[in-house]
């Protein structure tokens, strides 16, 4: 793999001309790996040249505290990149894993009645939680270190849909 320069905006993959980015979210971790080739083929047929990957993947990337599995993500990023589809890599912090919410229930947000939002959906974390931020930062650092030189990762985005489900947190802090 060749080293890429840092740019403010995503740059085309090596050998491609600049053009408008066209694509969307892709969640390969929610499907059997056997369908990935067909997914990529259909994306190419539709003219897709950029996809966001990893948005809700924290539990699959960090399978337990401090234990990271990037193998599946490496495979799909390479598969996409080799097909000429660039990757906007998400921080995977949109949905914390069950091991985190069980060990640290204080990361869960409360509604106006004081009821705690239970895990099982997305954005069940509270933005004011220092514990959540600490674990999210560890994940982001591990991902950045692992993917810093990957030529197929042309952009990064942190979390997803800020304020969508957890905008009204009535926790004490």
Regions found by a protein language model. Give the residues of each.
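Short, charged N-terminal helix-start/capping segments
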Residues: 1-13, 65-68, 80, 160-163
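Aromatic-lined substrate-binding rim segments of carbohydrate-active enzymes
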Residues: 37-117, 141-144
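Hydrophobic faces of well-ordered beta-strands that scaffold small-molecule active sites
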Residues: 20-24, 51-53, 87-91, 154-158
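Active-site region of glycoside hydrolase catalytic domains
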Residues: 82-88, 96-173
